[in-house]
């Protein structure tokens, strides 16, 4: 009789033996349908590996990672003026409990930029302030000139368009008047030809010229 018997090494080395009286053992295979436990174990392993990797890093790199995790990546989309920087510093001195996120929402910048402004210790001198004021005035004048130039270019373009339209309309009007004049002249010439036309012997139209009236001999003899 063919029976499956469990060997000493386990289910992997199942063998078929011909035995007369032994305990029947059927191979059982367990497949877990729930993968949540495996995912949890995998996540724990990843977290442990990440902690181990961070523990080997130097202190400055750990600080950068923590700042990126807290404030995000340094990618400024808006520049803050010097006056706004001074306002940020003074606001922080007046309200030290105010968070960087709230200040970032006020000024429309990232929290990382607020943190850098507060940590910076650079203060402009009088010469630097004069240079900054001159630069700001020059930039304002340049922007004003660009705006005026763009407005003038726009006006010139509109004028050119109107001029081209008027020229086209005048050409159309001239063409219409020329066509009307040609029609009138053709009608006049046709009427003159018909009035001066005389039929000949062969039945063809023949043009004649009107002669002045001259009295004949018959008119004199009465």
From Swiss-Prot:
Recorded coiled-coil stretches: none
Protein name from the UniProt record: Required for respiratory growth protein 9, mitochondrial
GO cellular component: mitochondrion; nucleus
Major localization listed first in the record, in broad terms: mitochondrion
Function: Required for respiratory activity and maintenance and expression of the mitochondrial genome.
Family classification: Belongs to the RRG9 family.
Location of this chain's protein in the cell: Mitochondrion
Keywords recorded for this protein, A-Z: Mitochondrion, Transit peptide
Keyword Mitochondrion in record: yes
Composition bias, Basic and acidic residues: 127-158, 177-187
């Amino acid at each position: 009789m063919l029976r499956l018997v469990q060997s000493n090494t386990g289910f992997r080395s199942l063998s078929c033996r011909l035995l007369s009286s032994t305990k029947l053992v059927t191979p059982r295979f367990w497949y877990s349908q729930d993968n949540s436990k495996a995912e949890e174990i995998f996540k724990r392993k990843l977290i442990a590996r990440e902690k181990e990797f961070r523990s080997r890093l130097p202190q400055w790199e750990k600080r950068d990672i923590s700042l990126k995790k807290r404030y995000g990546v340094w990618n400024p989309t808006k520049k803050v003026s010097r006056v706004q920087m001074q306002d940020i510093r003074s606001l922080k001195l007046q309200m030290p409990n105010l968070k960087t996120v709230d200040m970032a929402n006020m000024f429309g910048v990232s929290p990382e930029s607020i943190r850098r402004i507060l940590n910076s210790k650079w203060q402009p001198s009088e010469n630097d302030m004069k240079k900054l004021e001159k630069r700001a005035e020059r930039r304002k004048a340049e922007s004003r000139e660009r705006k005026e130039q763009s407005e003038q270019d726009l006006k010139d373009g509109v004028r050119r368009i109107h001029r081209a339209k008027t020229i086209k309309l005048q050409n159309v009007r001239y063409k219409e008047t020329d066509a009307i004049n040609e029609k009138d002249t053709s009608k006049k010439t046709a009427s003159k030809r018909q009035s001066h036309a005389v039929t000949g012997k062969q039945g063809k139209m023949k043009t004649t010229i009107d002669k002045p009236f001259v009295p004949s001999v018959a008119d004199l003899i009465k």
